[in-house]
Structures are given as C-alpha cells and as structure tokens.
C-alpha cells in the first residue's frame, strides 16, 4: 500500500495491485487485498486509479481470482486474454470458461478490463469477445513483451501488435526485464501509454537494482517530459480510458 501511494506521488495515474502472504509469496488472500486497498484509500489526498489483478499467482481457481475485484470494486482489473506456457515451467491458464465469468462480472460491476496481451493470438481472442459483447468497446489493451512463453520484447513485435489492435481502443506497452527501457521508449514513440514497475523489471540500470516502484515511475515521467509530453493525472486517465471513479 505504501509503495502504491509513493508511486502516485511520483506521478503514477494508475496502480496495479498484487498481494503477498507473510512469507512474501504471491497470494489471493482476500484479507490481504482488503488491507492493502483500504490503506491506499485511507490516504485522502490520493486519487490514484486502482487496478486489481485477476492473476495473482499460478493455479488459482476462478472464484478466488474474481473475489477481490467483486468485493473491492477497483476501476480496472486485468483480463489476460488467453493461456500460455509461463516461464517454461507452468501453464498460465485463462480458460474460456474463466474469461466468460470474469468478463461478465466486470461488466456487471462496471470495472474496466485491462486486456493483457502476450502474443498476437490474444488480440484475436479479444476481438472475438468484443464481437460477442463480452468486452465492451472501446477497450484498453496492455501489451506485455518479453515474458518467457510470450512474444519477445522487440520493437518489431510492438509495432506489429499495435497494428492489429481494434480501431478506437487505447493501449499501453511494457517490456519485461532487459526489455523494460527499450519498450518504454518505443511505446512513447508510437503514442502509447506506459506501464512501469517492479512486477516487470527489478533493475534501474544494468546490474543496479531499482529502489522502488516510485523510482521507476519518476524516470518514466522524466522521459515523457523529454519527449514533450506529460504524464496523465488520475482524472485525466479516467477520461482517456473511460473509467468510472469509485467513491468510498
């Protein structure tokens, strides 16, 4: 919660939330989610948009993946639009049954899906769900490159994935690990929004660990300013993405 608050102070418009258990392992513990979100919302000066993951750890069942979103009503929630061999060691499963459940609940709760894309097939899965009405348009896509099992973090892959996104949708890009900086710069050049943070990359420079999420946010903000752009405020992000602000 404190990391999210400091990231907002550094310029983040949206914070993406995972929780861990007391041993530091990824968790779906609903009490941890409540504690984390309530601590963020307790900062009355903080108007950051909250995005809760639907994929907090491997092998979660449908209900425990959806429950934090249902109970805490974020403005966004991740919607990983397909399955893949994750890190060459397990299956990151997003069964069509689960995606139907998740998409239906997000519509009912008025929570915007953050459609995470790890390869081109996931874009076409999203287009299918747009046609069936499961995903309400205009959609928001998060292109994630460099995860082992997904598309590699090259500019060519980013340009290609951007080219097949449905017209009128918003998008953001990010690179995992060593691709973090190249994909951030390419995303800025292509007119996308940015995602940065320790979930994707723990290094600030080669061999130098990042101090915090806030440090990575501050660098992204500086790069935008060097390009003649400005980081969006939370309210500007709400307008850009078509979010419904939740008041508690």
Regions found by a protein language model. Give the residues of each.
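Alpha-helix-loop-beta-strand connector modules within alpha/beta enzyme cores
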Residues: 1, 25-52, 100-108, 160-168, ...
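Active-site beta->alpha loop and helix N-cap motifs at the rims of alpha/beta catalytic domains
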Residues: 24-93
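Short, acidic/polar
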Residues: 1-5, 60-70, 180-184
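Glycine-rich, proline-tolerant flexible connector loops at the mouths of alpha/beta enzymes
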Residues: 13-36, 86, 144-145, 202-206
């Amino acid at each position: 919660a404190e990391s999210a608050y400091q990231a907002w102070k550094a310029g983040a418009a949206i914070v993406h939330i995972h929780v861990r258990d007391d041993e530091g392992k990824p968790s779906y513990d609903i009490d941890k989610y409540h504690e984390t979100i309530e601590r963020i919302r307790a900062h009355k000066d903080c108007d950051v948009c909250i995005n809760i993951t639907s994929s907090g750890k491997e092998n979660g069942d449908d209900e425990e993946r959806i429950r934090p979103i249902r109970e805490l009503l974020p403005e966004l929630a991740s919607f990983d639009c397909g399955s893949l061999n994750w890190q060459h060691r397990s299956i990151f499963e997003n069964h069509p049954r689960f995606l139907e459940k998740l998409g239906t609940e997000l519509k009912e709760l008025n929570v915007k899906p953050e459609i995470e894309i790890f390869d081109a097939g996931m874009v076409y899965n999203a287009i299918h769900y747009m046609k069936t009405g499961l995903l309400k348009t205009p959609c928001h896509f998060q292109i994630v490159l460099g995860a082992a099992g997904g598309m590699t973090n090259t500019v060519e892959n980013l340009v290609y994935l951007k080219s097949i996104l449905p017209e009128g949708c918003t998008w953001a890009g990010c690179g995992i690990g060593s691709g973090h900086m190249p994909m951030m710069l390419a995303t800025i050049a292509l007119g996308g929004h940015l995602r940065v943070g320790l979930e994707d990359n723990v290094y600030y420079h080669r061999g130098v660990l990042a101090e915090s999420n806030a440090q990575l946010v501050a660098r992204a903000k500086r790069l935008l300013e060097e390009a003649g752009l400005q980081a969006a405020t939370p309210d500007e992000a709400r307008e850009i993405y078509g979010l419904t602000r939740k008041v508690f």
